[in-house]
Structures are given as structure tokens and as C-alpha cells.
Amino acid sequence: MKRLLFFLTVVTLVSCGRSFEKRTAKYAEVGEVSDNRAAVLDINEGVGRWGYVDGTGRLAIECHYADACRFADGMAAVQVPEGAWGYIDTVGRFVIPPQFTLAEPFEDGMAWVQAAGELWGRVDKAGKMVIPCLYSEIGEPDERGWMRVLRDGKWGVLRQDGEVVVPCAYNLIGEPNAYGLIPMTSDGKHGFLGADGREVLPCFFSYISDFKDGYARTNYGGSMV
């Protein structure tokens, strides 16, 4: 009986795979299936529009988007013909209206979005801006969930929930050293931030080495100390 059930399962899967391929053969492009939806590109009279099919290849969301991302967390970023990006659910309803210049798929309930002249921020599934679109660069989070961010040419540090750890006031913020101290630079002077993000050694020095055996060499007032 187990062998028969296994055989029937395999036959069903093969049949479904063939049906999907047959039904989606008419599309110029077919994306990966995620959340039982796959993005498809339909070209009509030279104009391409994206929509979504279900796992069997049947059209689930009409093809009227200028661009479309894969579904994740039950939502997908799509671009309307006018140019703005928003997020739809699996039946094609806008959950977050088109308002962004760029939008990425959701991950763990949040997504990166771009607005206001190529500035990045982060939005949750309810459309709330967890991190406002103020940053030209946002780094990958470290093991603490801290991210280096660039705003108006100055670096700072945020937590993933948007809380400011270090204000955007420095020309450079480096990686923590073995002591957990974070090197930073401001107006050509160097110093260190503590593990909590507060200044422990202000930017007074024209040169400062990394710490070794608890000490660091500095140049202060033209002298090495």
C-alpha cells in the first residue's frame, strides 16, 4: 500500500509539473513559485505586463503591472505603469499603495523600500515605516542587529527596529575591534565608540592605532603617544 501511495504521489507531481509548464508556455518569462504564486510576463503588441499564476499555471492575478517581484510573507512588490511601487496580496489587492521608487520582497515581516530621491528605508506589512526613507546607504546587520547607515554624507548606526544607536555625525564608522570598540572619524580626527555606541574616546587624534594589550598609539598635538 505504501509503494502504491508513493507511486500515485509521484505521478500526481509529474502531472502537475507538466500542466504548469503547458499553461505558462505562452508567457515571455515565468518566475519561481512562492506562496503558490509565480510572476509571469505577458507581451501584447510590444508592451510587456506582469501578473501572477498559481502553482498549476492558471492565471491568478491579471497581467497589468510594469514590473513584479516574487511573493514572500503573502505579499509581493509590484510596479504600476505610472512608475510607483507598492505591495499586493495573493489575490491582487493593494495592501500598501504604490508610493515607492523601488521596493524589495518582504523578509521576516519587513521590506526595504526606496523613496524621496533614492533614499532607503524599511516598511512593515501594515505599511508602517519602521525606518524612514532618509538613508543613501544601509549596511547589513551585524550579530547584534546593528546597521551602519549613511545620511547626508555622514555615517551612523541603527538597530533593525529603526532605533538610533549612533547619530549620523561621522565621516567613517568601522567594524568593532577585539575589545568591542568601534573606530570612527570626524573632520580628519579619529576616536572610538564603546560597545553601547557612546563615545569613549572622542575624535581628538590625527592618528590612532588599534588597541593591543589594552593600549593604542595616538598622534596628539604632533607627538606620538
Give the role of each language-model region.
Residues M1-L4:
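Positively charged n-region of N-terminal signal peptides that target proteins for export
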Residues F7-L8:
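Sec-dependent N-terminal signal peptides
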Residues V14-S15:
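C-terminal motif of bacterial Sec signal peptides marking the signal peptidase cleavage site
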